Amino acid sequence: MMSTLFHPLRVKAVEPDTSEAVIVSFEVPPELREVFGFTQGQYLTLRGDIDGQDLRRSYSICAGLDDGELRVGVRKVQGGVFSNWINAHLQPGDTVQVMAPQGRFFVPIEPGSARHHVGIAGGSGITPILSIMKTVLAREPRSRFTLIYGNRQLQSTMFKEEIEDLKNRYMTRLVLLHVFSDEHTDSPLGFGVMNREKIGEFLGTLVPAASIDHAYICGPFQMNDEAEAALLAAGVPEERIHIERFGVALPSGATAGEVGAVVHQALPGDAKQARITIVRDGLQREITFTEGQPSILDAASAAGLEVPFSCTSGVCGTCRAKLVEGEVRMERNFALDKNEVAAGFVLTCQSHPITERVILSFDER
């Protein structure tokens, strides 16, 4: 059973990576090492009180499994209260409330396999892909990794020195392909925007689609969609494409701080009132949902239940639970794939009850 409790962790280090990003390392006491054991590509949910607000945000782990460290990369975001606070104010020795690692943005390691893994990253989307890349190179000695990495310019590139060190260590197994939107390079392929056309150029030349065993995509919302479309058009099977989303599509001119959670609306067919049983840590608690409440997550929080959540936008998947009984409708879903939905998993921050009786388990995640 995956823990969804917060634990106080001491900040070991806050290291500047670029002018807009820091790397935060945590000290994990011996009694919590099992709880904070992670799989490459997973994320941590941090919690903090900032200007009187109880905020939670998820940040991807950037360490490989063999690094012996727990660390995340945090980039400043225009209007992003938590990320900007971390960059400006978090210090070594501070204590942060941290939830155990979560996420399914990975493929199990196969030490004996000879596979070609491809990462397509944009900006801070490199963070989970770096974790995957380091782990694959260390634990699948016959496999190779190709990274297509988009940024505005070299100076704003996160983890550039660490990635170059990896290239020097795995010269025959790691291929790095940088793309800059604001800085020309010697190769026309290396200049431009990470859209479907640009990624398609790579798939038709330097990174033949037929050679790809698994592709990992993480970056801005539109880049994710366009990279997926390019891979599918090139013939990469859908089940070999893995996507991690950090946010929703922003309207033109909007900032991350201006676009919050989705506006929920009751629809015909939604239950006007429902009895919801919440299962967490083996305990059951019944609450009443009324039509005016935005979601089951909101109803649970209003009833005083401590339930896991982070973005409340249907993106991160922290609020995921298993539908044991009844039927719900999700407003939107960017975190669960079709197999997970078919298996009964829902995002409680987006869920409205349809039946008058619903049982949800946070212990089955």
Where are these regions (language model features)?
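FNR/FR-type flavoprotein reductase catalytic core
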Residues: 84-268, 275-277, 284
